[in-house]
């Protein structure tokens, strides 16, 4: 199993969700967060002077998939979140050793 962690623009969350649902990947956790990378936050002007706003609003998405679905999910997330502008986000893929559905006790792929 693989845990895909995607950091995307907040306005792309629904597009990413729809892309994953289209692949039959039905579970996802989404959190609001703030961050910065190459863009080093963003700058704003207030009555003339430029102010550094620091962090940029982002959405952190987590989805656990079967090994066989990981590459398709990664491609779908990248396509759905892409604008071509700085700040589109990043995707990380991490190995998952075990998973368990608490309600039923199902394990690993069956828990997804």
Language model regions located:
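Positively charged, small/polar-rich N-terminal and surface patches that mediate targeting and assembly
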Residues: 1-112
